[in-house]
Amino acid sequence: MLVGLLAGGLGTNAKAQAFQELLEQGSAGLQVLALDSERGLRENSLLNPGNRIARLPAGQTEVEGRLDLKLATDTFEVSLKPRARFEWRRFGETGPETRLDAWVNQGLVTLYPVQSLAVSLGRDVLMWGPSNFRSPSNPIYFENGRNNPMRELRGVDVAQATWSPTQALSLSLLHQFGDGRGDWQWEKEDGFKALSLMKVDYTAEASVVGLNASKRWTHARPRFGAFGQTTIGEALLLYAEGGLRQGTSALYPERLPNAVGGAFLPRHARDHRLIYSALAGGGYTLDSGHTVYLEYLSNNEGYRWADGARYFDIASSAASVLATPSPDAALAGQTLGAALNNGLALLGRHYLFLQVQNNPTDTGPTWQLRYALNLVDGSGQASAYAEWNIWSRLALFAVGVMHHGGNRTEFHSLLSQSILVGAKGYVL
């Protein structure tokens, strides 16, 4: 009996020791952010007269908690990133609103059945490509989130398998079955459509190339994407990125004999027109360690000059109808809502982008300057970001944005300027 008790005790101790060793392979981090933002709304906006359509808050105070948990072994990896945010939104004369959100931004289980294979299931942020302005090769994240380092991209629900037969070559198959905002469905009322994607990546000594093909599980046609980058010497980086498909469900302005002079309709939803977005750029690192990026984006899904003029003509008519009591006010509101939610990530066709940043490893503040110019309507957006580590576990940050152009231009149609200031602390 004594021998049995000793054996049981030794077994319990072994299990406890194994569990402790497993915990030592994990990590945990808790970050708390507190920030305040103020927006300068365009007073004579044609798209958002009196802020009645977009209902943008003039100011917003937020407190957000970001918990990061990870456990990694040779055979599996588990990560979980729950988030919670409290918002106090200020709308001027209509009074403030409060909101409390909690969600899982990322949560992934990855298995490694063999050394060259990884199989994962859960919620993840799927980013690739070298571009700073936009990511045209990515069918999920064209908006790559790099304009504001303080904001996280929302994860999407995916199942993924990646096979790497060599260190240079990898093949990935993935299926996106949810948008990361709740129910996992193939097709939702809010317009979500499941997506299947195949991606091939090849890494050489100084170059990276990636190709992908994807399809939404609807009548949408396949989409193709590609990116490539190469380093020349120690200072110069050159890259290109693009996406291609047939047709688009985006809304385009059409003249109609109604009270607002037109409507926004899916002009190219059923045709075989090739829709592309292509970016070419480069980065050069100066002797000081600062890096300068210059990019050009061509996007034929955007409006031609005539469509852009018609877009704001219809918006102007709708705004005039809303200015006075009218039986056509509902139509005017619906028209402006369609103008703001037309399915286009960018309104125009040709853009120039400049970014300058310091070396993040430098002592002192980290900073980044960005400027985007619509080459057709002449409007632009300039932004500056800075972050100061004032203590090992505390940092201050600020983001300022300025817009220029007329009220019939892309970048200056809703906002004139905005500023965000805050602090982030690491509790764990």
Q: Residue ranges of each PLM-predicted region?
A:
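Outer membrane beta-barrel
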Residues: 63, 69-176, 405
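Residues that define the transmembrane beta-barrel architecture of outer-membrane proteins
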Residues: 57-63, 100-105, 153-157, 192-196, ...
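Outer-membrane beta-barrel "beta-signal"
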Residues: 352-356, 388, 413-428
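Transmembrane beta-strands of outer-membrane beta-barrel pores
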Residues: 30-38, 71-75, 84-90, 123-127, ...
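Membrane-embedded beta-strand positions of outer-membrane beta-barrel proteins
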Residues: 24-30, 80-82, 121, 161, ...
